[in-house]
């Protein structure tokens, strides 16, 4: 078959990598580079050249089995990483606030005042209680129950909720704290359990040596697919068992036997002027939220106490309407084993940008937002796969991570290959 793939992130690239062995595959990417969230930036840091990831950064072999196999196939070199977590509401004030990190007893009580805070001790006690419930308790909660309601029902304190669990979830999914309260509790708990976030013995995290772009290069080199960058798909029309793909607002199109939409749900919907009611419902129920991302060296956007600095740093702040602002600073030195002589941070949604003279780059990444409607849409996704020779994939079909994007594409590859096999047998009989 002649197959069009729209989007060159993990889902589109993986689908092309697998399907190009038996099909003629063309990948359309609107940007000038391939990789999607696999975005490595070259930084000139006082004359030192450093490659830094700004999107996909880490994985582990337990929860990313497909990606692990792919890296083995491509002979991708990786290094051990770190996934420590810190909380700070003191980073931008002269005194007070709260800071702690889970690295050790010393970092938990790096702010010595925590030793004398009953609410802090209560939070630590409730972390243990939460882990016990998650690991051994009854998780038969209604799939529609929100995390906020679940925490209230189990009588967890505001300190535990606001200084630990909600910030961690907000950091993981790049989601506002308020939205985390609406996150389905059952899905949240299952994610924590599957990723062993409730265990002492956690999986070893790894990062791609030289940056995530290195695996993208190797994947593209090992496929016969035709990758077209700077080729923005502006419309897709499906008729007469064929698919017409329009590029760069030109009134010309290429014709294919099938199309794989490996883009964000809202992007896919914008291309389809003939989406049926089911496609419209499923794709519109999985929404995206834009995030502002800065690559910089401004220490003001890290916890005040350097002892607390962790791989992931949740910075708690509020806007003028008293709404909580989700700001996360990734300490890239710890995540990518970069010499600490060159402090580098990737910060999402800071209340104020880092100093311009300390900034290496600004980017915008959209992340899927998960609620009851989103998970319901995922469960119905198979009902539209293959209809009118169209398939849909992306990290949005899982929990929003690299492995989810790969597995989503793998399901489509399996579906297309099985249909192709059945058709071959039918034609031969």
Question: What kind of feature is each model-predicted range?
Answer:
Residues 2-27:
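N-terminal Rossmann-like FAD-binding beta1-loop-alpha1 element of flavoenzymes
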Residues 11, 33, 266:
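Conserved Rossmann-like nucleotide-cofactor binding loop
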Residues 20-44:
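Glycine-rich FAD pyrophosphate-binding loop
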Residues 41-67:
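N-terminal glycine-rich dinucleotide-binding loop that anchors FAD/FMN and/or NAD(P) in oxidoreductases
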Residues 42, 103, 322-429:
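Conserved flavin/dinucleotide-binding core of flavoenzymes
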Residues 61-182:
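Mobile amphipathic helical/loop "lid" adjacent to a hydrophobic cofactor/ligand pocket
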Residues 188-246:
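Helical element adjacent to the flavin cofactor pocket in flavoenzyme catalytic cores
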Residues 232-366:
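Mid-domain catalytic core of redox enzymes
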């Amino acid at each position: 078959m002649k197959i069009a793939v729209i989007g060159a992130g993990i889902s589109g690239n993986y689908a092309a990598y697998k399907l190009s062995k038996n099909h003629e595959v063309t990948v359309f990417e609107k940007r000038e580079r391939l990789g999607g969230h696999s975005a490595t930036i070259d930084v000139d840091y006082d004359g030192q050249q450093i490659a830094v990831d700004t999107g996909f950064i880490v994985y582990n072999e337990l929860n990313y089995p497909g990606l692990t196999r792919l890296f083995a196939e491509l002979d991708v070199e990786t290094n051990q990483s770190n996934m420590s977590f810190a909380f700070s509401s003191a980073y931008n004030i002269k005194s007070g606030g709260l800071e702690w990190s889970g690295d050790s007893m010393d970092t938990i009580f790096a702010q010595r005042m925590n030793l004398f805070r009953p609410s802090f001790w209560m939070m630590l006690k409730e972390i243990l209680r939460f882990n016990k419930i998650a690991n051994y308790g009854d998780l038969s909660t209604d799939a529609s129950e929100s995390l906020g309601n679940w925490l209230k029902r189990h009588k967890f304190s505001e300190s535990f909720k606001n200084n630990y669990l909600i910030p961690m979830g907000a950091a993981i999914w790049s989601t506002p704290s308020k939205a985390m309260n609406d996150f389905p509790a059952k899905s949240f708990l299952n994610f924590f359990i599957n990723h062993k976030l409730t265990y002492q013995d956690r999986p070893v995290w790894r990062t791609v040596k030289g940056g995530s772009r290195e695996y993208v290069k190797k994947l593209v080199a090992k496929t016969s697919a035709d990758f077209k960058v700077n080729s923005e798909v502006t419309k897709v029309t499906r008729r007469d068992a064929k698919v017409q793909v329009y590029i760069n607002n030109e009134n010309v199109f290429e014709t294919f036997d099938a199309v794989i939409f490996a883009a964000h749900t809202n992007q896919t919907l914008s291309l389809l002027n003939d989406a049926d009611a089911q496609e419209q419902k499923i794709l519109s129920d999985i929404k995206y939220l834009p995030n502002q991302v800065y690559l910089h060296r401004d220490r003001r956007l890290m916890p005040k106490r350097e002892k607390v600095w962790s791989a992931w740093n949740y910075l708690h702040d509020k806007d003028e309407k008293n709404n909580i602002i989700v700001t996360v600073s990734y300490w890239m030195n710890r995540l990518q084993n970069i010499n600490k002589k060159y402090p580098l941070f990737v910060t999402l949604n800071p209340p104020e940008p880092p100093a311009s003279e300390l900034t290496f780059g600004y980017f915008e990444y959209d992340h899927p937002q998960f609620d009851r409607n989103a998970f319901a849409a995922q469960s119905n996704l198979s009902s539209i796969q293959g209809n009118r020779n169209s398939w849909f994939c992306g990290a949005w079909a899982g929990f929003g991570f690299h492995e989810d994007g790969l597995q989503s594409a793998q399901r489509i590859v399996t579906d297309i290959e099985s249909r192709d096999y059945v058709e071959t047998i039918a034609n031969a009989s």
